[in-house]
Amino acid sequence: IKNCIETSPLFSILKKMPKGGILHLHTSSSGDANWLVKRAIADENCYIYTQDDGSVLQGKMAVFPKGTAPPGFRPMHELAAKDNHFITKVVEMITLTPEDSASPNPWDKFEACFERVGGLVYYAPIFIDYYRQSFEALAADNIQIVELRAGSGEFNGLYDINGNNYSSDEGI
């Protein structure tokens, strides 16, 4: 149905129209999930937790200097090279579906999505690219106003591969 809607003449007219705004947009979910996963795969320092042992959330993504990833974390670029469905599998772990919202505990999946991507979106190189991509997509859709929802200290969580942390002023 989604494809039918997106290819309809009415949808193309609506796409060109100016929009109001997006309110309460979470900073770590403002971008395209496919783009984020592909960007992570392009960075050899991005890892994903692959075990289902309860010690770390399966699918949690993080950035580590080469050779320092804790047990259970595997390089995303290596997994993607071996599995043609890797991107789809990861996107499903970080995206809410209608089935998730109908489940008895939809907040569990919602919170897990944020936990899975948090290690990526606050890694400075990805953060910069992620926001650029996010705002370019919003501008292309004629969104006029964006209200970002950032928790206290959220922009203080920015870091780089050398272990440097950045202040909220530097993050913004």
Language-model regions, residue ranges each:
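Metal-cofactor-binding active-site regions of metalloenzymes
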Residues: 1-172
